[in-house]
C-alpha cells in the first residue's frame, strides 16, 4: 500500500494577506505558488511565503482541518502562525536553493 502525506498550509504576502490550501506534495505546491504557476488568489495577491503548515496521514483529516482553518477569523489564524513562526519567516525560503544555477568546478584535462 502506498503511503500518502497531506499538508494543510498557509501562505502570506509581504503585506500579510493569507491563503490556506491543502496538497499531497507540499514542496511541489509551494514551488508552484512561488513561481506564479497557479492562476488565482495567490498569484494576484503575491502570496509566496510559506508561514505555516501541518502534515496528515489521512486525506479526510487534512480536508477537515483546511475547512476549519478557513472558517477561523483573522486573529485566530495569526495566533496559530505566531505559535510556530512568530516572525512570519518564509519556512520554504531555502528549500529550492539547490536548484539555482551554480557553475561546476572545472577539472583540468589529464595529461596523457
What are these regions (language model features)?
Residues 1-38, 43-53, 60-67, 84-86, ...:
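GIY-YIG nuclease catalytic motif and its immediate N-terminal context
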Residues 44, 68-80:
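Short arginine-rich
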